[in-house]
């Protein structure tokens, strides 16, 4: 059976709708009112007026038709017109075969023939990644996995901010640390970056160049020798990009395309975009500045592109970059994962791209709010490395990759998050990641015990898997495709974590209640082993989306 159980019920309802000339779409709920295995639909309520019938009368008509399908062990009508059905256990048991046949592909949606380009992290190459970048990295990488599972072709993008004043400040920061490492009394400007990481880079530069730059002067944002300034900029960018790439790899984040802001300048993309705006009559001059007509696409005011002193505003290179990305990637949708402080920037970016002739909806922003670390009941600030940020590498030393990824994915990205470091290191059921990985460990333990006893799992259509928790779990496993679809549509990493927790909650209860390996009832034991394999496979598939590993033993 290739259809899911929910698709079967939907198809049955849809066929009846067509027979009765009903155009409404059936809506289905699972395990309603905490009734294991119950499928419920409000189709009779929402369509009764269309056929001029009372909801209860229409529900009785639907019941008669559903009985003819021979798919349901129970069909009940509840006021004021709900249809509640229980699928026959033998039909429900086919879920196991579906899962174990498709394995890692279980839950995959049909190919969408659409390209989604996701830009995430995009931290300035001015230092290490911090905990805010970590949340962005998790949300972005989980969305990548989720959209792939949902049938999209997904491209990953990191925008390197390697132009602009922050890179000039970086060069001066590293230069000052270089001078200080040579025991020269060099005063660090107030706007420079803080942290011992710059000492490490300064030592590398000294090893290669010795003290040949010791007599060169500097300002707040400029080394007063163009060649040396350019050298320190490039060395610093290369050094921190290499570190960022390694830190992301260690955090199970893989980004394929790294685009450069400096390249946008060097290839004159900004000038090309300015000409394009003029050719489309999308810009105008006022008080010596060049404005963009963003109010035509819903912005609250027109935005300055070029100031009266002929310098560019921040939005112009961003618009050029995104326009270039649309042409380069041929993506149907650009999704940028941005920090919450960028909210006011969204409408002007969308308007600016639309004025270039792009689809006004092609750019979508996924907001990621701040994350605060809590330890011993209060905000946690690290002092291992001097500086103001809490570094990703330090957090990973405390809690590990899987725990941090899971917890950062488990809350809506659009809400502020307190991350309890004490909670995620506990080894009990109050810790969501431990609770989830303990479920996979238990599955492995059961299957290993059976292997030792030489009992092999059995997968076949059966009515023996009729325990309420078995029925409830089978329906939840069956619903995986719907969870993938809804999570992708809602851009929700949290829904996948909620799904995992739901499976684990029922499974742990089932494990405590049922003797799974019963050598006095080998047929049921073998069927339950197949059931356990299916649970493990779906958990593995869900874990893969989050980017964490199933645990074999604990």
From Swiss-Prot:
Chain positions of motif 'HIGH' region: 123-133
Q: What class of enzyme is it?
A: ligase
Q: Which Pfam families match?
A: Arg_tRNA_synt_N, DALR_1, tRNA-synt_1d
From which residue to which does any coiled coil extend? none
Query: InterPro entries recorded for this chain?
Result: aa-tRNA-synth_I_CS, Arg-tRNA-ligase, Arg-tRNA-synth_N, Arg-tRNA-synth_N_sf, ArgRS_core, DALR_anticod-bd, Rossmann-like_a/b/a_fold, tRNAsynth_Ia_anticodon-bd
Task: Please list the GO terms describing molecular function.
Answer: arginine-tRNA ligase activity; ATP binding
Q: Which reaction does it catalyse?
A: tRNA(Arg) + L-arginine + ATP = L-arginyl-tRNA(Arg) + AMP + diphosphate
Enzyme Commission number(s)? 6.1.1.19
Q: Which family does it belong to?
A: Belongs to the class-I aminoacyl-tRNA synthetase family.
NCBIfam families in the record? argS (TIGR00456)
Protein name as catalogued:
Arginine--tRNA ligase
- The record lists the organism as Mycoplasma capricolum subsp. capricolum (strain California kid / ATCC 27343 / NCTC 10154)
């Amino acid at each position: 059976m290739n259809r899911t159980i929910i698709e079967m019920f939907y198809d049955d309802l849809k066929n009846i709708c067509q027979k009765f000339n009903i155009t409404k779409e059936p809506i289905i709920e699972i395990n309603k009112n905490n009734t294991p295995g119950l499928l419920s639909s409000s189709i009779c309520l929402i369509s009764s007026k269309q056929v001029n019938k009372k909801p209860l009368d229409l529900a009785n008509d639907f019941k008669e038709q559903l009985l003819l399908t021979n798919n349901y062990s129970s069909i009940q009508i509840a006021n004021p017109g709900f249809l509640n059905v229980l699928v026959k256990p033998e039909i429900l048991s086919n879920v196991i075969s579906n899962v174990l046949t498709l394995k890692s592909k279980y839950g995959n949606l049909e190919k969408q023939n659409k390209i989604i380009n996701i830009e995430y992290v995009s931290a300035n190459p001015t230092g290490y990644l911090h905990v805010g970048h970590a949340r962005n990295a998790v949300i972005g990488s989980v969305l990548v996995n989720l959209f792939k599972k949902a049938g999209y072709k997904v491209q990953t993008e990191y925008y390197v901010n390697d132009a602009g004043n922050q890179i000039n400040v970086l060069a001066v920061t590293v230069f000052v640390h270089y001078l200080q490492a040579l025991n020269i009394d060099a005063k660090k400007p107030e706007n420079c970056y803080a942290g011992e990481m710059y000492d490490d880079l300064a030592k590398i530069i000294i090893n290669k160049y010795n003290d040949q730059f010791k007599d060169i002067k500097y300002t707040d944002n400029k080394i007063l020798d163009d060649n040396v300034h350019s050298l320190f900029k490039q060395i610093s960018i290369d050094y921190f990009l290499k570190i960022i790439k390694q830190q992301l790899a260690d955090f199970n984040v893989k980004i394929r395309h790294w685009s450069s802001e400096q390249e946008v300048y060097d290839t004159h993309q900004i000038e090309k975009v300015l000409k394009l705006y003029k050719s489309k009559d999308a810009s105008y001059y006022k008080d010596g500045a060049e404005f963009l007509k963003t109010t035509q696409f819903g912005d609250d005011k027109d935005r300055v592109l070029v100031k009266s002193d002929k310098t560019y505003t921040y939005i112009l290179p961003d618009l050029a970059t995104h326009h270039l990305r649309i042409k380069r990637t041929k993506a149907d949708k650009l999704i940028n994962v941005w920090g919450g402080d960028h909210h006011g920037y969204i409408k002007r970016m969308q308007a600016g791209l639309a004025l270039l002739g792009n689809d006004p909806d092609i750019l979508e922003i996924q907001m990621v709010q701040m994350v605060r670390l809590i330890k011993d009941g209060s905000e946690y600030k690290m002092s291992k490395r001097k500086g103001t940020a809490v570094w990703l590498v330090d957090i990973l030393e405390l809690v590990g990759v899987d725990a941090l990824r899971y917890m950062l994915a488990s809350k809506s990205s659009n809400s502020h998050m307190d991350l309890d470091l004490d909670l995620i290191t506990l080894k009990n059921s109050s810790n969501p990641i431990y609770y989830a990985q303990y479920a996979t460990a238990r599955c492995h333990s059961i299957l290993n015990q059976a292997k030792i006893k030489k009992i092999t799992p059995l997968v076949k259509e059966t009515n023996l898997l009729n325990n309420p928790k078995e029925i409830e779990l089978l329906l939840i496993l069956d619903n995986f495709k719907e969870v993938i679809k809804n999570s992708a549509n809602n851009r929700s990493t949290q829904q996948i974590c909620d799904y995992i927790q739901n499976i684990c909650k029922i499974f742990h209860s089932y494990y405590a209640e049922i003797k799974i390996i019963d050598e006095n009832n080998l047929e049921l034991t073998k069927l339950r082993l197949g059931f356990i394999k299916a649970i493990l496979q779906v958990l593995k598939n869900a874990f893969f989306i989050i980017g964490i590993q199933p645990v074999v033993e604990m």
